[in-house]
Amino acid sequence: MEQAPEDQGPQREPYNEWTLELLEELKSEAVRHFPRIWLHSLEQYIYETYGDTWEGVEAIIRILQQLLFIHFRIGCQHSRIGITRQRRARNGASRS
């Protein structure tokens, strides 16, 4: 007879606890890089759109992740991640 495999993996914390911890980490990181008024407006928009639901929590997590990714990719002054802006040589020596 076939049997379902036993769950031998590590104990995982519940999804809602993990999600709320992730949201708090993203919010604390976002406050370092964006004006508080922007973040407050974003939270207000999410609350008006989704109310106090898990969909709203997931939406704000997704938006904050995207904002932070783009912010770092463009080149945050506080981060080593991002596009390195190279100075162009005036004599054109760097052209190939």
Swiss-Prot record:
During virus replication, may deplete host UNG protein, and incude G2-M cell cycle arrest. Acts by targeting specific host proteins for degradation by the 26S proteasome, through association with the cellular CUL4A-DDB1 E3 ligase complex by direct interaction with host VPRPB/DCAF-1. Cell cycle arrest reportedly occurs within hours of infection and is not blocked by antiviral agents, suggesting that it is initiated by the VPR carried into the virion. Additionally, VPR induces apoptosis in a cell cycle dependent manner suggesting that these two effects are mechanistically linked. During virus entry, plays a role in the transport of the viral pre-integration (PIC) complex to the host nucleus. This function is crucial for viral infection of non-dividing macrophages. May act directly at the nuclear pore complex, by binding nucleoporins phenylalanine-glycine (FG)-repeat regions. GO terms for cellular component: host cell; host cell nucleus; host extracellular space; virion component. The lineage of its organism: Viruses, Riboviria, Pararnavirae, Artverviricota, Revtraviricetes. Its main location: virion. It comes from the Viruses. Phosphorylated on several residues by host. These phosphorylations regulate VPR activity for the nuclear import of the HIV-1 pre-integration complex. GO terms for biological process: DNA-templated transcription; monoatomic ion transmembrane transport; protein homooligomerization; regulation of DNA-templated transcription; symbiont entry into host cell; symbiont-mediated activation of host apoptosis; symbiont-mediated arrest of host cell cycle during G2/M transition; viral penetration into host nucleus. HIV-1 lineages are divided in three main groups, M (for Major), O (for Outlier), and N (for New, or Non-M, Non-O). The vast majority of strains found worldwide belong to the group M. Group O seems to be endemic to and largely confined to Cameroon and neighboring countries in West Central Africa, where these viruses represent a small minority of HIV-1 strains. The group N is represented by a limited number of isolates from Cameroonian persons. The group M is further subdivided in 9 clades or subtypes (A to D, F to H, J and K). HAMAP family: HIV_VPR. It is found in: Virion; Host nucleus; Host extracellular space. This is Protein Vpr. Residues 1-42 are annotated as: Homooligomerization. InterPro entries: RetroV_VpR/X. It comes from Human immunodeficiency virus type 1 group M subtype B (isolate OYI). The modification Phosphoserine is found at residues 79, 94, 96. Belongs to the HIV-1 VPR protein family. Keywords: Activator, AIDS, Apoptosis, Cell cycle, Host G2/M cell cycle arrest by virus, Host nucleus, Host-virus interaction, Ion channel, Ion transport, Modulation of host cell cycle by virus, Phosphoprotein, Transcription, Transcription regulation, Transport, Viral penetration into host nucleus, Virion, Virus entry into host cell. Homooligomer, may form homodimer. Interacts with p6-gag region of the Pr55 Gag precursor protein through a (Leu-X-X)4 motif near the C-terminus of the P6gag protein. Interacts with host UNG. May interact with host RAD23A/HHR23A. Interacts with host VPRBP/DCAF1, leading to hijack the CUL4A-RBX1-DDB1-DCAF1/VPRBP complex, mediating ubiquitination of host proteins such as TERT and ZGPAT and arrest of the cell cycle in G2 phase. It holds the Pfam family VPR.
